């Protein structure tokens, strides 16, 4: 299933909003995937990533 995850992560300039569509078996795995992607691409720790909404795409 595909999930659309919306949220924001902290940068030096402030909070940067994002929307990611990920393939996952359930909502929990979708969240883990987004934390992993944002963290690796932007060098942001999980406590600086705020998830606002997760819905099935």
Curated annotation (Swiss-Prot):
Gene3D superfamilies: 3.10.20.10. Pfam families: Ribosomal_L18A. Coiled coil: none annotated. This is Large ribosomal subunit protein eL20. The lineage of its organism: Archaea, Methanobacteriati, Methanobacteriota, Archaeoglobi, Archaeoglobales. It comes from the Archaea. Part of the 50S ribosomal subunit. Binds 23S rRNA. GO terms for cellular component: ribonucleoprotein complex; ribosome. Belongs to the eukaryotic ribosomal protein eL20 family. GO terms for molecular function: large ribosomal subunit rRNA binding; structural constituent of ribosome. GO terms for biological process: translation. It comes from Archaeoglobus fulgidus (strain ATCC 49558 / DSM 4304 / JCM 9628 / NBRC 100126 / VC-16). Keywords: Ribonucleoprotein, Ribosomal protein, RNA-binding, rRNA-binding. InterPro entries: Ribosomal_eL20, Ribosomal_eL20_dom.
